[in-house]
C-alpha cells in the first residue's frame, strides 16, 4: 500500500512541507493551518508517519518541468452549507478522470493522476480547461505550491476520497480508484468532455455570474451579485420584466 501511494504522488524530489491545523476557523468556516517547508527528499518513512497520524505532509507535483499528477482545489466561498455532492456528481456525469478527496480545510481536492511524466504546461492547460468549464476554483496545481496529502492518520482519517455515490473510501479503495483513473499522456491530450449546461443559456452568462450561481453568496457582496444577476435576467427579456418579477427572481437566487 505504501509503495502504491508513494508512486501515485511522486513529485518534487528535493523538498516537501509539513502542515499543522491551528484549531482556528476563519470567517468562511475554513480550518486554518501552519506550513513548514522541509528542504530534503520525502522518504517512505516520512509517508508512513503521515499515515500513522504523526506528521501531516504536503507534496509539490512538479519535478522540474514535468509532473505525474495535478489537482483542482475547491475552496468554497462559505463552508457553512457546503457539500461535495454536486462536484462528485459533475465528475460522474461528465466522466472526468478526477478523484475527489476531502481536504484538511474541509473543501475538496480533485486529483488527476497520470501513468507517465507529462509537461507541467500541458497538464495545467487541461486542468484549467476543466476548472473553467465545471468548477471555477481559485487554485489549480501544479502551481509551484505543495498540496497536503490525503489519508493523514489513515485508520481514522477525515481526509478521504469519495466514490461516485459520494460515499467515503478507505485508503485501499482510494488507491484502486485512483489507479483505475490514471491516464497516459496521449489519453489526457485526446480526452474530450461534453458542454456543461446546468441551466438554460448557461454559455451566454459571463464567468462572474456563472461563479455566483454555482457558489453560495459571500455575505459582504451579496447585493452586488444579485444586482448583476437581475441585470442579466432583464436583458434576456429585452427589459420586459416588472419589479415583481425581478423580486421573485432575486428571492429564488438568494436561497
Which residue stretches match the model-derived regions?
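Modules that initiate DNA replication and primer synthesis
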Residues: 77, 107-108, 112-126, 153, ...
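Catalytic residues for metal-mediated phosphoryl-transfer on nucleic acids/nucleotides
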Residues: 72, 88-90, 94-97, 194-196
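Glycine-rich, often proline-containing surface loops adjacent to acidic residues and nearby aromatics
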Residues: 63-73, 103-113, 146, 226-227
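Short beta-strand
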Residues: 59-62, 98-105, 138-142
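Short amphipathic beta-strand starts and helix->beta connectors
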Residues: 51-58, 91-98, 215
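DNA replication initiation on ssDNA origins
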Residues: 1-69, 77-87, 145-147, 151-154
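Helical (often loop-to-helix) elements that flank the catalytic cores of nucleotide-handling enzymes
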Residues: 80-93, 113-138, 155-173
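Catalytic "initiation/cleavage/transfer" segments centered on a nucleophilic residue
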Residues: 5, 134-196
